[in-house]
A protein has these predicted regions:
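Paired small-residue
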Residues: 86, 90-93, 101-109, 298-306
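Helix-breaking motifs and short loop linkers at transmembrane-helix boundaries and internal kinks
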Residues: 43, 75, 96-102, 240, ...
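Helix-loop-helix hairpin linking two adjacent transmembrane segments in secondary transporters
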Residues: 102, 130-187, 230, 234
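Helix-to-loop junctions at the C-terminal end of transmembrane segments
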Residues: 63-75, 260-272, 357
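A late C-terminal transmembrane helix in Major Facilitator Superfamily
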Residues: 325-361, 369
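Conserved MFS/SLC helix-loop-helix module at the cytosolic interface between two early adjacent transmembrane helices
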Residues: 62-98
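Cytoplasmic helix-loop-helix junction between adjacent transmembrane helices
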Residues: 106-144
Length: 395
């Protein structure tokens, strides 16, 4: 009985980390589900409201590496609690924001905490789970991301529709405060594995496989968020869905991420290259078919299942590759670069989507993202896989 109790306690830090992933992912994409509401309340266009996503992502992209280098010697539990506290304060500021730029400033505070969080979350998941459970640890925190899409983002949208988007942000602040207390109680002290100097960065960037991981991550995020950042108005205005059906479709999209998480834990290690190819090619195809599928609600939902599942699976697989190919004393730095570049892609995708909406048509966001996805898939097959094979042959 005591053994089972001790075994359960070993998983509590991962549970706390997964809850934290839930709120961090919920808030990053909260404006997607509330885009129309925020734009109307602040008297700005939907494209300008979409910049709340872009700027958030660009701040993460710019600040991930410098903030992580500064914090690289800090004890990890203390670091985790500090960034969660900043996250809570920033959400309260968002709820009280009087205008567009005040809201943008509070989002920048969230983005700075996010920049460090996603640099340390995957390595922490690997370090806190029992030996041999690496894939399960990574897939568990990915489940937190999926639940954010299933419950967090749609619930935030529902709250926003009925009582206002400000209450949504305040609710996240309250939930995150409880998560802070849980992590304070259960998380062990974990010392950093050494300070990383900026002088070591060139050697890290000479790793061709790691560079390929980073490039594919930027391309994927840009392609994905060109379409996904404007999925809410697309579903309402192009697919002709009612507000309730839009919410349901967002839930389906997020819920499919759990399928991606399960598929990673089941199939990834058996054939990593095949898994990676599927997770690059399938979302690309979904983007290209988005407009064609919009003629039917069920076709759109089916497409969202495949798209959502493969997007999550891609993210976990490339987090694993970052940790796998980065030097042991630089896994957090490798993840900070991955997170920064992925968020650069998110910002670029939201920006490209905004350009398409403003200068072409909302209906064309899938085609724009799909073209970028084709470039990503070609690079993956032509350059990344050969470099990956050479690297693994030398290990």
């Amino acid at each position: 009985m005591q053994t089972k109790k001790d075994s359960f306690k070993r998983w509590l830090p991962l549970i706390g980390l997964t809850f934290a992933v839930f709120v961090f992912n919920t808030t990053e994409f909260m404006p997607i589900g509330l885009l129309s509401d925020i734009a109307s309340d602040l008297h700005v266009s939907e494209a300008r409201a979409g910049m709340l996503i872009s700027v958030y992502a660009w701040v993460v992209a710019l600040m991930s590496l410098p903030l992580m280098i500064v914090a690289s010697r800090m004890e990890l539990k203390r670091l985790l609690l500090t960034i969660i506290a900043v996250f809570v304060v920033s959400h309260v500021a968002s709820a009280l924001a009087e205008g567009y730029y005040t809201l943008m400033l509070s989002r920048i505070g969230m983005a700075c905490s996010h920049a460090i969080f996603w640099s340390i979350a995957p390595p922490l998941a690997v370090r806190t789970v029992p030996d041999g459970r690496r894939a399960l640890g990574l897939s568990t925190i990915a489940t937190g991301s999926s639940v954010a899409m299933v419950v967090g983002l749609p619930l935030g949208r529902v709250i926003g529709l009925y009582v206002g988007w400000r209450v949504t942000f305040f609710s996240i602040a309250v939930i995150t405060a409880f998560i802070f207390l849980f992590i304070l109680a259960v998380f062990p002290r974990l010392e950093s594995r050494g300070r990383f100097s900026i002088k070591q960065l060139p050697s890290l960037l000479r790793n061709r496989v790691l560079l390929g991981v980073f490039l594919l991550s930027v391309l994927f995020a840009t392609a994905h968020y060109t379409g996904y950042s404007y999925i809410e108005p697309f579903l309402g205005k192009i697919a002709g869905m009612s507000p309730n059906t839009v919410t349901l479709t967002l839930i389906v999209f997020g819920g499919a991420g759990m399928l991606g998480s399960i598929s990673f834990s089941k199939f990834y290690m058996a054939n990593r290259r095949r898994f990676i190819f599927v997770t690059t090619a399938a979302p690309t195809l979904c983007l290209l078919l988005l407009l064609a599928a919009s003629v039917n609600v069920w076709l759109t939902m089916l497409l969202c299942v495949v798209w959502g599942a493969m997007a999550t699976a891609f993210n976990i697989a490339f987090q694993d590759n970052t940790i796998r190919f980065a030097p042991e004393n630089a896994t957090s730095i490798g993840m900070s670069i991955f997170s920064g570049l992925f968020n650069l892609g998110i910002g670029c995708g939201a920006y490209v989507g905004g350009l398409v909406v403003s200068h072409a048509s909302l209906a064309d966001i899938g085609y724009a993202g799909g073209v970028i996805g084709v470039l990503m898939t070609v690079y993956c097959v032509a350059r990344f896989f050969p470099n990956m094979c050479k690297r693994e042959a030398r290990r």
